[in-house]
């Protein structure tokens, strides 16, 4: 072979190799030196009512924010309020089922009656409500494979399953533990945090049969849960013991329950998301450690078993729940800019500040 032909072949093979690396869906890229993550927008909303979860519907470009008795609906692009659904009680979270044009929101008509409210995604009108059969009806997810809504009843230590098509309760299960976040793996399983047990449970999405219970140690209080479905890794955000203790982010192999790595985070985390398009993991924490500001800890999955810190984005105190727009790669948090100090007592030596709902806002983090 002539030198010219050899060099030409070598160059061509090099190009093919580079293309294979760039376009392989399983390739992991190192975390960038300068991440560029920052608070790129705040949306002042004010208003009344407490809050828990925030939900982004990236296809409809809407943000859903339940606030005690009503749901504020925002246009994601403009930040304007496009709807405000009234007439509910003690609301927590929203899940959307676009193929049925339905939104589901967890609430409690009373302390003894957990409720799943249903609304029309187009008209933003309430259409139905269902008794959960338990108390403290809290977090929820919609699984498009089973077409079911999986509802966690926190203090009720139970699960309620609602068929999104029929709006009927089609299953239930006792956890004998306090459930927090859940995620569907797209292969027939649901994974769920059991906060007071320091465990993650895996159960069958159709039969509700428990498959496994895995220890989350060194995490003792798992509350946030996200998943890299391609590489079968669970990202578990955990609170520390006590209100002033920092937490930890744990990475677990979903197939065998082994904790492969962990990283410290700040105080009072209450959610986590994984961006499959970038490999970034976000853990929003109520308290950065100074008692005045919050922080969102951002990591990057360099490999399935290795994460590296990317950025600490300071936010307002109390911003601890989060939702991802996978199309823009931006995340959204909620909280109040003003939080009034509360005097300590013998029973509560480290009380949380009292949020001022008139300073309620949405925080958008991105690049």
Predicted regions and their residues:
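Predominantly soluble domains enriched in secretory-pathway, periplasmic, or organellar proteins
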Residues: 5, 17-21, 25-367
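Bacterial N-terminal signal peptides that target proteins for export
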Residues: 2-14
């Amino acid at each position: 072979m002539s030198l010219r032909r050899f060099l030409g072949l070598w160059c061509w093979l090099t190009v093919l190799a580079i293309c294979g690396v760039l376009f392989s869906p399983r390739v992991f890229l190192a975390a960038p030196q300068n991440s560029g993550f920052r608070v790129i927008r705040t949306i002042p909303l004010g208003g009344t009512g407490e809050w828990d979860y925030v939900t982004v519907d990236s296809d409809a470009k809407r943000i859903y924010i339940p606030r005690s008795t009503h749901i504020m609906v925002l246009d994601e692009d403009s930040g304007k309020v496009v709807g405000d659904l009234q007439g509910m009680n003690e609301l927590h979270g929203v899940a959307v089922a676009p193929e049925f044009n339905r939104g589901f929101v967890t609430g409690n008509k009373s302390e003894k009656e957990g409720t799943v409210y249903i609304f029309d995604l187009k008209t933003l009108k309430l259409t139905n409500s269902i008794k959960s059969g338990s108390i403290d009806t809290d977090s929820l997810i919609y699984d498009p494979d089973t077409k079911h809504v999986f509802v966690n009843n926190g203090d009720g230590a139970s699960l309620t399953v609602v068929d999104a098509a029929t709006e009927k309760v089609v299953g239930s299960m006792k956890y004998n533990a306090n459930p927090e976040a859940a995620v569907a793996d797209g292969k027939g399983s649901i994974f769920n945090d059991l906060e007071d047990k320091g465990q993650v449970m895996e159960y069958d999405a159709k039969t509700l049969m428990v498959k496994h219970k895995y220890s989350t140690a060194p995490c003792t209080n798992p509350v946030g849960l996200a998943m890299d479905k391609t590489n079968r890794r669970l990202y578990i955000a955990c609170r520390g013991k006590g209100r002033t203790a920092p937490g930890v982010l744990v990475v677990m192999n979903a197939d065998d329950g082994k904790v492969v790595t962990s990283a410290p985070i700040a105080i009072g985390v209450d959610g986590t998301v994984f961006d499959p398009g970038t490999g970034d993991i976000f853990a929003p924490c109520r308290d950065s450690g100074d008692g005045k500001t919050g922080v969102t800890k951002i990591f990057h999955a360099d490999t399935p078993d290795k994460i590296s810190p990317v950025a600490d984005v300071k936010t307002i105190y109390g911003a601890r729940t989060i939702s991802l727009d996978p199309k823009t790669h931006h995340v959204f948090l909620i909280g109040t800019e003003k939080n009034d100090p509360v005097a300590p007592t013998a029973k509560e030596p480290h009380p949380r500040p009292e949020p001022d709902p008139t300073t309620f806002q949405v925080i958008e983090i991105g690049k």
